[in-house]
Amino acid sequence: MAVYTEVSDADLAAFLEHYNLGRVRALKGIAEGVENSNFVLSTETGVYILTLYEKRVEEGSLPFFLSLLDHLAARGLNCPQPVRMRSDGALGRLAGRPAAIVTFLEGVCRNRPSIADCARLGAALAQLHLAAADFKGSRANALNLEAWPKLFAPIAFRADEVKAGLAATISAELKFLQANWPRDLPRGIIHADLFPDNVLFLGDEISGVIDFYFACVDDLSYDLAICLNAWCFEPGGAFNIDKGAAMFGAYASLRPLSAAEAKAIPTLARGAALRFALTRLVDWFNVPPGALVNPKNPLEYFAKLQMLQTIGDARELGVLI
Amino acid sequence: MAVYTEVSDADLAAFLEHYNLGRVRALKGIAEGVENSNFVLSTETGVYILTLYEKRVEEGSLPFFLSLLDHLAARGLNCPQPVRMRSDGALGRLAGRPAAIVTFLEGVCRNRPSIADCARLGAALAQLHLAAADFKGSRANALNLEAWPKLFAPIAFRADEVKAGLAATISAELKFLQANWPRDLPRGIIHADLFPDNVLFLGDEISGVIDFYFACVDDLSYDLAICLNAWCFEPGGAFNIDKGAAMFGAYASLRPLSAAEAKAIPTLARGAALRFALTRLVDWFNVPPGALVNPKNPLEYFAKLQMLQTIGDARELGVLI
């Protein structure tokens, strides 16, 4: 949750003069998104989300994110759509930060996704990959295989504070992944952070996918691996193969996996588990003062990694081969 | 800002079955209120605020707060109005906490109130006092003169960590206030926390007064003293007598102050300054882990107290005598 920057009523009124949204009717800082400050903004024309981009988001990537949302929305995907300024731009400045207004999506995220929800998620992910296939923009994954050792190095000496033996576990896993990472898989735009709190449901249908600020070009099947870890484990930590099978099955019905992709899932899932374990570990040691953020427990993802290390065959994760 | 308790989609759906509000369309935790968890709740019938009452609010006082809001709304005051359950009650339970739904008020709070805003605030406060005059409920002020020494005692030994000499300043002020606190002033329901972030404006008019969870029976003029401190000092710390005069003038045009009330304002303002300085100091030393709260700087209110200690006559604060 996050509101890092306060917005004054005077600054907001001045900012809105760049838009055709009428005057402000309400503004509430919301507990959504970890990297940016987000507000529900109500104006004379409707309800929107106002985002102020904080330092952790590279400003150079903002046009990529915003034009990706435009592209996906134009293809009928339920994602936030950037609202144009009178100047036709989508990116302004407010309270000293880059800022944008996007449409508000109805829906509530699922705290405990069901097997059917995992199927819906799989289909939505395939739709996202297909809708983005002809998107011209490009952004490298700043949190890929090459980045993980660099994330780990500055905190390696403290990792065992969180759990004895953690530093050795991470070093060994990094070596395994460097040696075994799959090459030449189909690439494209991935969401890269499609956790349950970024998927909105209305009744039994997915009404929206949000928070594209990790989107990048990478292996499409790596996005599935991220979702496998985020959606298909039970709260107690057990993997649920029915959820995996539902997700992979629904995805593959729209975008079939190649044999190489299917085979690579266990390794990709180990990488995805390590990636979130590492960034959570970094956050754990680096909660900025006054950030109003509860760092997520990194051990959840180390436990998932430990389970994934026991998997010999993608079918054990629900992949249909 | 605060969201202490997460609400699952399943628990929320079950909770809404007690209401005639239709199904949920969106739920966003918001950065509003320090004591409770607040959400903007959108349903098929409209937009509301959902509040989960956390431990710091005495559960026994919740019926008082909710019936006060009913009373004020019935008299035309723009305040949140509790939404009735099918059972006619206004107080339910959600995620293990007492919980209520109230109407959503449009408007944006003023970060830097103008002189005219201070006049509007004065009039709104008088309207609140008058509208509450025939309210039957009663609640003692848990943070009154008698409570301040008890707030201070457990943190007295640490006060000088915040500023050298602070403990002695507080002790001397407590003695002064015990000896000089005005008696027999007109009493009634006071808001007791009417800071700028609890007053919503649409354009140049006040569109709503919110957050009644400190409301109680006390000296009506003490409510004015709280507002004087919260509204009539500039960001740099200087007192603005024009703002004081605007506030007192607009208030008195609806509810004239007695001579005793007018004369008491400087002492009441010292008490009000000490009350907020003390609770901020307590919070400063007691930020609960994971509370997602930025404690407010207690020194702001000690600086106001210091200025108020130099005031010999209520007219120096803008009171018309």
UniProtKB/Swiss-Prot annotation, chains A, B:
One of its GO terms (molecular function) is homoserine kinase activity. The keyword Signal does not apply. GO terms for biological process: threonine biosynthetic process. It catalyses: L-homoserine + ATP = O-phospho-L-homoserine + ADP + H(+). Pathway: Amino-acid biosynthesis; L-threonine biosynthesis; L-threonine from L-aspartate: step 4/5. CDD domains: HomoserineK_II (cd05153). Keywords: Amino-acid biosynthesis, ATP-binding, Kinase, Nucleotide-binding, Threonine biosynthesis, Transferase. Its EC number is 2.7.1.39. InterPro entries: Aminoglycoside_PTrfase (IPR002575), Homoserine_kinase_II (IPR005280), Kinase-like_dom_sf (IPR011009), Pseudomonas-type_ThrB (IPR050249). The keyword Nucleotide-binding applies. Belongs to the pseudomonas-type ThrB family. PANTHER family: AMINOGLYCOSIDE PHOSPHOTRANSFERASE DOMAIN-CONTAINING PROTEIN, AMINOGLYCOSIDE PHOSPHOTRANSFERASE DOMAIN-CONTAINING PROTEIN-RELATED. This is Homoserine kinase.
